[in-house]
Amino acid sequence: MQLRRATMDDALDVLSWRNDETTRMNSFTQDEISQENHLKWFKKKLDDENCLMYILEDKNVKAGSIRVDITDEVGEISYMIAPGERGKGLGKAIIEQLEGISEIAGNDSKCQIRCLVGFVNEANIASSKCFKSNGYTELIAGDIKCYIKNI
């Protein structure tokens, strides 16, 4: 299992995962996203120097994606697991692997991330468990849970 940087070749897989009913149910934005809008957004994220986007591959199969948007030394995590790959512990693994990447862990001089955060809908129990099992501190505000970890 490994993380690699995302490319435009991954855009349609990520769109398919994002528009999956279960993914949408657990997302803050639950509407389906059009291919046209997604491709524009995906390219913009790939070109953004304050965004790091990765694909998780397990036995040469694309199994999920994880993105970190960096603002003022804080990296906000957003991830999803491909529908056919859920239930295999990959949510915990994708976060754990992200923390070991040199761009995130601080071994890359361009990266100044001091803290990672993830926001989770209260109903998304699986994602909450993934953050907790990776040592994140949970804060709750209404129906949103925030998970924080200094790195």
What function would you assign to each model-found segment?
Residues 38:
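Short His-centered aromatic/hydrophobic patch
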Residues 4-32:
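A short, well-structured alpha-helix characteristic of acyl/acetyltransferase catalytic modules
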Residues 25-27, 54, 117:
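Short, hydrophobic secondary-structure boundary micro-motifs
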Residues 16-20, 44, 133:
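Residues within well-ordered alpha-helical secondary structure of globular protein domains
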Residues 31, 35, 88:
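Flexible, glycine- and charge-enriched loops at secondary-structure boundaries
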Residues 19, 46-47, 103, 107:
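Residue-level signal for alpha-helix termini/capping positions
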Residues 2, 6-11, 57-151:
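Acyl-donor (CoA/ACP) binding surface of acyl/acetyltransferases
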Residues 43-55:
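A short helix-loop-beta-strand connector motif used in the catalytic cores of GNAT acetyltransferases and
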